[in-house]
Amino acid sequence: MLSAWLRVIRVRFLLSSVIAVSVGLTINWWQTNQIDFLHALLTFGGVLVLHASVDLLNDYWDYKRGIDLQTQRTKLSGGTGVLPEGLLKPSQVYKAGVLFLVIGSLIGSYFIIIDGVIIAILLVFAVLSIYFYSTKIVDLGLAEFFVAVKGTVIVLGTYFIQSSQITTHSIMGGIAVGVLSSLVLFITSFPDHDADKAKGRRTLVIILGKKKATNVYWVFPIICYTMIGVGVAFDIFPTFCLIVFLTLPILIKCGKNLRHSFDDLTKLLPIMNSTLLYSRLTGLLFMLGFIFSGVYKLQQ
C-alpha cells in the first residue's frame, strides 16, 4: 500500500520543488546571511504537499479520461500506473489530492497572516491552478507555461517569506528554475503524444508536432542560461552561479539525439532520463552558486 502511494505521488519528481524552495532560501541567505529555519521548514512542507496534490489529481483525471489506459508507461511518462493496475481506488487518490491541497492551503494561510497580501495572491494562484491543471490548463495548451510559472512562484514565495521583498534576484532566479521544470514536462510528453491528443489534451508537442517540437527543446535551457548569465553580468547573481554551464555537455547531447529519436521510445528513454538529470543538476548548481558565494563572503 505504501509503495503504491509513493508511486502515485511521484516522489522522484518532488525534487524540483525542493530545488525551487532551496534556491529561494539560498538567494536570501547569500544576501543577508540569515534564514528563518521554522519558516523554511513550513515552506518546504507546504510546497511539497501542494506538489503532491497536483500529481495526485493529475493521475486521477488522466485515469478518468482514459488517457492512462492508452499510454505506454515508462518511469518518466504515461502516468504512474497505480489506478490502471487497481492498486488504489480512484476515489482514494482524488480525496488524497484534495486533502493535500487543503493542508498546503492551511500552511499558506499561516504565511498570509504573517506576511500579508502578496502571499495571499500567490496562494490563490497556486490552489486554483493545481485544482484545474488536469482539466483546464493542459487542455488549453498551457501546461509547460504553468509549470514554469509554478517554479517561479515557489522561488518568489520562499524568498518573500524570508525577506518580505520581491526583487529582481528572486524573479530572475525563479524563471531560471521554472523553465528547468518545464523542460522535463516537455520531454516526457513526447511518448504520450498519441494518447494525449486522442483525449483532447494540448501539450506543446501536440500543438507543434513531434518533429518541430524537437527544435523547441532548446528554448527552455536558453531562457535558463540567459537569466543566469545576464544576472551575473549585471551583479544580480554572484559569479559562482556560472557553474551552471557545467551541465551544457549533457544538454547538447540530449538535444542532438532528440532530433533523430523523438519517435523511437527505446532511444527516447535515455534522452528523457538525461534531461531529468540535466534539469536537477543545473538547479542544484545554481543553488550551490549562492552557497559558495555566501561562504566566500563570510571568509573575507
Feature locations, PLM:
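Topogenic membrane-insertion module of multi-pass membrane proteins
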Residues: M1-L38, L42, G46, V138-F145
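Small-residue-rich segments of transmembrane alpha-helices in multi-pass membrane proteins
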Residues: V18-G24, F146-F160, V177, I206-K210, ...
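Helix-coil boundary and interhelical linker segments in multi-pass alpha-helical membrane proteins
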Residues: L25-G45, S105-A120, V155-I175, M227-F240, ...
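Membrane-embedded alpha-helical segments that form the functional core of polytopic membrane enzymes
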Residues: T32-L57, A120-I121, F125-Y131, H169-I187
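Acidic (Asp/Glu-rich) catalytic motifs at the cytosolic membrane interface
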Residues: V49-T74, L183-V205
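Multi-pass membrane catalytic core of lipid/isoprenoid biosynthesis enzymes
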Residues: T71-I112, V205-F237, L277-R280
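Intramembrane alpha-helical segments
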Residues: G79-T168
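Extended hydrophobic alpha-helices typical of membrane-associated regions
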Residues: A233-L298
